[in-house]
């Protein structure tokens, strides 16, 4: 079923007017939502644990409190802390301070959909999920545009949850460019699948495998890096701007012919079956439980995965090549730590 794009004109009720808003977390999404909402005239406070994010929020001019204090003061509470810490944060500091008629929001449905967080029946639960990272949500807002967003209602205790969700999306600039209504189930499962099978897991595995095939065949690692990784952005930018059609119109006939001939040899029916298995593990909660259990155990799996990835030859080759290419962007690993 096709969904209809909605815009600022479709946001009929200023549901956030007169409400005290608490943004919980001041990371990637937190800093963007809070600053954009403030700039659109809303009353925003920050709830965050002591540390760099707390200090940054105060530096940016926000009244900043502990999570518990911010929850007590607020009518609408948006939880933008990392997925893996939301459950303990909610149970320890948010749940004891909620009141009937409050609204609790999320930018991703993970903890609600998989029932790690259960909100009382007399509290609204909504979602505003921008389809872009926080720095882009903020930058495009400042440029007069925005990032499209999904919105959803999981629990409508007051009858106002949808209006709150849409007005939140408007407040961060998303309604300038388009909103799509969804459900917590749909957003959560599709988002995780996209990340794992295509955008992050699938893409990095494809690049690394291509690099291995070339280097194992005797080609220079530096040249292999350019062919399978460096040029990826050039192709993705074309697809982003105009779909497969623009990309194919922009490349050589040789490249286009090879696209049609060899793409299906790489992404076979077996790969599609593997993708379906990934989706099944998302749908049945296996991935969610594995992720949360690893976090509760001290992240042994995630730590091991990170160490293994850091030692890949393609990473070492790329690090050296990028030193000679300042035009590719920020090389400082600490650049966005305050917002992650």
Curated annotation (Swiss-Prot):
Residues 183-328 form the KARI C-terminal knotted domain. Keywords: Amino-acid biosynthesis, Branched-chain amino acid biosynthesis, Magnesium, Metal-binding, NADP, Oxidoreductase. Residues 3-182 form the KARI N-terminal Rossmann domain. Its cofactor is Mg(2+). InterPro entries: 6-PGluconate_DH-like_C_sf, KARI, KARI_C, KARI_N, KARI_prok, NAD(P)-bd_dom_sf. Mg(2+) 1 binds at residues 191, 195. It catalyses: (2R)-2,3-dihydroxy-3-methylbutanoate + NADP(+) = (2S)-2-acetolactate + NADPH + H(+); (2R,3R)-2,3-dihydroxy-3-methylpentanoate + NADP(+) = (S)-2-ethyl-2-hydroxy-3-oxobutanoate + NADPH + H(+). Gene3D superfamilies: 6.10.240.10, NAD(P)-binding Rossmann-like Domain (3.40.50.720). One of its GO terms (biological process) is L-valine biosynthetic process. The active site is at residue 108. One of its GO terms (molecular function) is NADP binding. Substrate binds at residue 252. Belongs to the ketol-acid reductoisomerase family. This is Ketol-acid reductoisomerase (NADP(+)). The lineage of its organism: Bacteria, Bacillati, Bacillota, Bacilli, Lactobacillales.
